[in-house]
């Protein structure tokens, strides 16, 4: 008669009469950007049938190692393309996958952006120098120095800088000539 084998994961294998083995497929967890591989361990909970005098399950576990393919999550920095002197540049970090834990991103200008768990973006403001009569605008280029956290397999900063043009607001300087009415 057939043998019914119940496994610790709830699955059941039937070994047909006259056969010595049976099998069943088990679906492993899907690949994602967070997991770093794992193992699956299954034992026999019970075995019945087969008209044996005594049917004793082997207590040893069948252990399978699930190899993980490393998936990359990228952190990209963006900013306003232009502001006027004295304006505010908003730097935004965008992740290609939501963070499971907070992500700390350190910028080349020393500022730090935190992307909260469950989110893909975080921002911080940078105050540009006030308008003055001497400077003629400039360009600010900022990159990501480091990015940590998120429980990602691999978190890679995009090396492309966030570039903002600081436009000069033209100030008029007036020169006045005065002379004494008599010499």
Question: Where in this protein do the model-derived segments appear?
Answer:
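Contiguous beta-strand segments of beta-sheet-rich domains
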Residues: 2-7, 21-49, 93, 101-106, ...
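Short strand-edge motifs at loop-to-beta-strand transitions and within beta-strands
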Residues: 11, 20-24, 62, 111-113, ...
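Beta-strand-rich interaction surfaces with strong enrichment in secreted/lumenal proteins
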Residues: 11-15, 30, 111-115, 130
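Extracellular lectin-like interaction modules
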Residues: 24-27, 37, 64, 68-83, ...
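Terminal edge beta-strands and adjacent linker/stalk segments
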Residues: 45-71, 145-172, 178-182
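Short, solvent-exposed loop/linker segments at the N-terminal edge
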Residues: 81-87, 181-183
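Short edge beta-strand/loop segments characteristic of extracellular beta-sandwich folds
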Residues: 90-96
């Amino acid at each position: 008669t057939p043998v019914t084998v119940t496994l610790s994961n709830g699955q059941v294998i039937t070994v047909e009469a006259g056969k010595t083995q049976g099998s069943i497929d088990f679906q492993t967890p899907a690949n994602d950007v967070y997991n770093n591989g794992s193992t699956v361990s299954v034992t026999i909970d019970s075995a019945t049938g087969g008209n044996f005098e005594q049917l004793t399950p082997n207590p040893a576990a069948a252990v399978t190692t699930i190899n993980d393919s490393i998936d990359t999550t990228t952190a990209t920095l963006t900013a306003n393309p232009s502001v006027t002197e004295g304006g505010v540049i908003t730097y935004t970090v965008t992740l290609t996958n939501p963070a499971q834990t907070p992500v700390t991103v350190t910028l080349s200008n020393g500022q730090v952006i935190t992307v909260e768990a469950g989110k893909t973006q975080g921002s911080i403001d940078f105050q540009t120098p006030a308008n003055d009569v001497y400077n003629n605008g400039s360009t600010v280029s900022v990159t990501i120095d480091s990015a940590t956290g998120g429980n990602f397999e691999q978190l890679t900063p995009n090396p492309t800088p966030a570039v903002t043009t600081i436009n000069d607001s033209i100030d008029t300087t007036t020169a006045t000539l005065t002379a004494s009415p008599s010499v």
